[in-house]
Amino acid sequence: MAETAAGVGRFKTNYAVERKIEPFYKGGKAQLDQTGQHLFCVCGTRVNILEVASGAVLRSLEQEDQEDITAFDLSPDNEVLVTASRALLLAQWAWQEGSVTRLWKAIHTAPVATMAFDPTSTLLATGGCDGAVRVWDIVRHYGTHHFRGSPGVVHLVAFHPDPTRLLLFSSATDAAIRVWSLQDRSCLAVLTAHYSAVTSLAFSADGHTMLSSGRDKICIIWDLQSCQATRTVPVFESVEAAVLLPEEPVSQLGVKSPGLYFLTAGDQGTLRVWEAASGQCVYTQAQPPGPGQELTHCTLAHTAGVVLTATADHNLLLYEARSLRLQKQFAGYSEEVLDVRFLGPEDSHVVVASNSPCLKVFELQTSACQILHGHTDIVLALDVFRKGWLFASCAKDQSVRIWRMNKAGQVMCVAQGSGHTHSVGTVCCSRLKESFLVTGSQDCTVKLWPLPKALLSKNTAPDNGPILLQAQTTQRCHDKDINSVAIAPNDKLLATGSQDRTAKLWALPQCQLLGVFSGHRRGLWCVQFSPMDQVLATASADGTIKLWALQDFSCLKTFEGHDASVLKVAFVSRGTQLLSSGSDGLVKLWTIKNNECVRTLDAHEDKVWGLHCSRLDDHALTGASDSRVILWKDVTEAEQAEEQARQEEQVVRQQELDNLLHEKRYLRALGLAISLDRPHTVLTVIQAIRRDPEACEKLEATMLRLRRDQKEALLRFCVTWNTNSRHCHEAQAVLGVLLRREAPEELLAYEGVRAALEALLPYTERHFQRLSRTLQAAAFLDFLWHNMKLPVPAAAPTPWETHKGALP
């Protein structure tokens, strides 16, 4: 009973979003500024500006038309950013302030596909999908040149690095490179040697040599004085970008003699250095490529000495230029987040499994990202061991892997196991100590994997690769896919949930069947043991959550509230409450004792596949198909403290208001009553003020001293008062003061003024008509009073006259 009472006192009532990990790069161009401190990348309708040091998005720039950004470029002086949208508008930004300094039509008849600044940051060239190339003077704000002749989409433009030569290069879908003279306004030459799309152009320091790369798996060296190809270098991969390296020896990259060397990035996913004179590859990046690691973009920031690459998985990688040593990793887009877990003994990191073979580890404090390679197919599930240093992952490649994070936050794969014949969809780690893990697969079996003793040593570093795991127990558990497995807090029981609509309880380590939980109408997505009681929670595609007794396998409670499948469930508040997530994008907080849904959290836009709670039970983590990972903070205590402070303040102010009313200090009481949001008290105060002979002047003087928000509140009160004929006079008095003393522009700026006026008009007309009829009736009565003449009464006859009239 004492434990129950303590648990009730710790009931949670609300969570608030503390942080979001959202997409910031969805492919296309990415660019560093000259200092290497800021990274610019496209994400739909926005250009995001990242701080390289922290990985945080400093600012998002979005054009007024809210159309997708098709191209952008940053000037060499780092001052001006120009963006182009599908609405055929160009926007010039002062990006450091986040403001648009100029907006103009691109004049292209189709969206702008590429753009580039000249070395002086004065001219901007744009290439469109209409085959046209235009040149703009950014300083004087006019178009200078319009070049036609390119068939199809112009996807590449570049100025010659020598501004005195006034040359512009472009390439379209015909794989030719056109050289345009800005001085003669003509095409000087057409360079034809590529057989597929040209992807990049680079120029030597003296400006006499140009390097071009293409998807035809060759790079070509051009002599710009003769406009002839001097050498063709086969690189044996589709090249997306080629960069000329500085002409200085770099032994780490195989650059030992003077000459022209260039760096290529392509579909093999590795950076390679080539000697132009011999056509030989002198350096190949040691990092082995993996699925989705094809390089789609590469640039060199000479001043910062950094190479930036982008992968097909929308990851941005920064390398030190002289050694190609990896410096930074940024996960631009996680696609569909399938599972999330806190990582580290203090939950300092987050590991995310998305629709990719790679895992992403984020440090919550600094936003630093680490991308983990190892699986060869999509990772489906994660789980963390008790101490937080080790975690497990399973994937569609039919394998399970164990990863270790060191104290520096670096993660490496230390063990792997295989044996399932289909995708491994769920994994659970032992709870008491780091001794084993259990996996469930689409082959309808579960496997128990004991951890080797060598794996438990923190100093163990597998020099020869990950340790191989051997399954100790394999058991066929269900007739359909196993979606979830859970290990009891004492490591002696195993629960499995399947698409066959049942959950089963097994004894570990032999996997002996103890009982079956039946009652759901559709397949089960999640099973979870209570940390305090002998209870199992199951979440199903039928939209319900059920609690089951482990002793007799009976259903104790059913929670209904989700409109779609319930994908995850977790116990919080020492087993007295539940957190659940569903395919409707909602996260719900339930109190078990009364089956009540305490709070519904709506921050995701799609299926919430991942749900995990922190060790201290003060944070929750969710991941969804909308590519968002959200960190939730328990704000129950903060809200309760805030509510208590607010109530105490209300009591003090209410007492002050009562004192003012008792002392008949109505003018001060009016503002206080408005602040307390007491319409009836405000009405009483105004009625008291209007009983004074000088009511109009006092009411007007008091209202003029009110703040704008108080006047807005008073106007809202008037709407309610005006609906009652007994209080309409006070409402009209207040409205009259506002209309007489406030300028129309100020009144229209009030919050909700239009709705208030619409509500006031019909009742005001009705009151006016009623008062007009009353006034007419009063005038008619006054008229009758003044014009009414009463007849003079006749005098009564005397007794003698009466007697005389009776004689004959």
UniProtKB/Swiss-Prot annotation:
Family matches, as SMART domains: WD40
Compartment(s): Nucleus, Nucleolus
- On this chain, the residues bearing N-acetylalanine are A2
Q: Which GO terms describe its biological process?
A: endonucleolytic cleavage in 5'-ETS of tricistronic rRNA transcript (SSU-rRNA, 5.8S rRNA, LSU-rRNA); endonucleolytic cleavage to generate mature 5'-end of SSU-rRNA from (SSU-rRNA, 5.8S rRNA, LSU-rRNA); ribosomal small subunit biogenesis
Spell out the InterPro entries in the cross-references: G-protein_beta_WD-40_rep (IPR020472), Quino_amine_DH_bsu (IPR011044), Utp13_C (IPR013934), WD40/YVTN_repeat-like_dom_sf (IPR015943), WD40_repeat_CS (IPR019775), WD40_repeat_dom_sf (IPR036322), WD40_rpt (IPR001680)
Q: Which residues carry this modification: Phosphoserine?
A: S257
Cross-link for Glycyl lysine isopeptide (Lys-Gly) (interchain with G-Cter in SUMO2), residue positions? K407
Which residues constitute the signal peptide according to the record?
none
Q: Show the GO cellular component annotation of the record.
A: 90S preribosome; nucleolus; nucleoplasm; small-subunit processome
GO molecular function (one): RNA binding
Annotated function? Part of the small subunit (SSU) processome, first precursor of the small eukaryotic ribosomal subunit. During the assembly of the SSU processome in the nucleolus, many ribosome biogenesis factors, an RNA chaperone and ribosomal proteins associate with the nascent pre-rRNA and work in concert to generate RNA folding, modifications, rearrangements and cleavage as well as targeted degradation of pre-ribosomal RNA by the RNA exosome.
Task: Describe the protein's quaternary organization and the partners it interacts with.
Answer: Part of the small subunit (SSU) processome, composed of more than 70 proteins and the RNA chaperone small nucleolar RNA (snoRNA) U3.
Q: State what protein this is by name.
A: Transducin beta-like protein 3
Organism encoding this protein? Homo sapiens (Human)
